[in-house]
């Protein structure tokens, strides 16, 4: 089970690979759409890559609830527990 810091670092890498954003820009309080300017197609790619990286399943109906990076970190941490 990964720590929240490890999950954040992993998500930052995934976001960087998909969007080119610096990993340092990916912070817990950042909104995927408003702050990081991630569109729905990129978000789905990020979700699929996060599922593979962390060994969790993020149902499609949950993706809309992942507004911030912190929401995603919490969801992944709980899914791994």
Curated annotation (Swiss-Prot):
| Predominant localisation class | cytoplasm
Q: Which residues carry this modification: O-(pantetheine 4'-phosphoryl)serine?
A: 40
Pathway given in the UniProt record:
Lipid metabolism; fatty acid biosynthesis
Q: Cite the post-translational modification comment.
A: 4'-phosphopantetheine is transferred from CoA to a specific serine of apo-ACP by AcpS. This modification is essential for activity because fatty acids are bound in thioester linkage to the sulfhydryl of the prosthetic group.
* InterPro entries cross-referenced by the UniProt entry: ACP, ACP-like_sf, PP-bd_ACP
What GO biological process terms does the UniProt entry carry, in alphabetical order?
Answer: lipid A biosynthetic process
What domain of life is recorded for the organism? Bacteria
SUPFAM superfamilies, per database record: ACP-like
- The yes or no answer to whether the keyword Heme is present is no
What subcellular locations does the record give? Answer: Cytoplasm
Keywords (A to Z) from UniProt:
Cytoplasm, Fatty acid biosynthesis, Fatty acid metabolism, Lipid biosynthesis, Lipid metabolism, Phosphopantetheine, Phosphoprotein
User: Know the name of this protein?
Assistant: Acyl carrier protein
Q: Which organism is it from?
A: Arthrobacter sp. (strain FB24)
């Amino acid at each position: 089970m990964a720590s929240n810091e490890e999950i954040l670092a992993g998500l930052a890498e995934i976001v960087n690979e998909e969007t080119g954003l610096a990993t340092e820009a990916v912070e817990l309080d950042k909104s995927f759409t408003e702050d990081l300017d991630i569109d729905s197609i990129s978000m789905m790619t990020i979700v699929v890559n996060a599922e593979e990286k962390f060994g969790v399943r993020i149902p499609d109906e949950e993706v809309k609830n992942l507004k911030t990076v912190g929401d995603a970190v919490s969801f992944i941490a709980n899914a791994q527990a």
